[in-house]
Amino acid sequence: MSVSLSKGQGVSLKKNEYDLSSVTIGLGWDINEEKKGFLGGIFGKKEEEYDLDVIAFLCNSAGKVTDLGNVENGKPTLVNGDIIFFNSLRHKSGNIWLTGDNRTGAGDGDDEQIIVRLNSLDAQYEKIVFIVQIYNGEKLQQHFGKVQNAFIRAVDARNIEMARFDLSGGPAFASQRSMVFAELIREATGWKLRAIGEPSESDSFVSHLRNYM
């Protein structure tokens, strides 16, 4: 039975209870529809499309990201390192990857997914942090206040939902454009999924990355 988490809560995903050979971390969301005028009242046309991205940081025992990817002109590019995002979809180990980029949130179920082979993940990785951002949110004046029915969930290799964290928007999130959504923490008997839900006004995951360096 899936465990529904509240902010700050965690649940153990034990190897003897679930198949952790391949775990799907799914993210989903809806955008509030705004009706304008007579035609808007008929069709309920969305005011705009939101592009939400999910990002994963692979951290060591100290909770830090140590590999920032390829270096160009003396600066790390974050590509082919320990960060999984839209410009670096697959980790070099082959044990964690992003399935694609949904730019609208349309449709039922997961809008974006990160697949993790937890049983095969190198021992040096003790934590995986999941960030959600609104791409170009500042430029487009978009924010989580209009994001509804947002969730992150963990599903094992047998398609059994193990845990879920639901987080809707609202006035309190009207200036927030990114969020530390959840994290996976390695335990002796498996992994723990912890719900965080800490928002930020920045629309870039890089602002969160600084806390893990």
Swiss-Prot record:
Xref: InterPro entries: Stress/Tellurium_Resist, TerD
UniProt keyword annotations, A-Z: Plasmid, Tellurium resistance
Keyword Acetylation: no
Keyword Ribosomal protein assigned: no
Superkingdom of the source species: Bacteria
Biological process annotations from GO: response to tellurium ion
Protein family according to the UniProt entry: Belongs to the CAPAB/TerDEXZ family.
Listed PANTHER family: CAMP-BINDING PROTEIN 1-RELATED, GENERAL STRESS PROTEIN 16U
Primary role: Not known; seems to contribute to the tellurium resistance (Ter) mechanism. Also involved in phage inhibition (Phi) and colicin resistance (PacB).
Name the record gives this protein: Tellurium resistance protein TerX
Organism field: Serratia marcescens
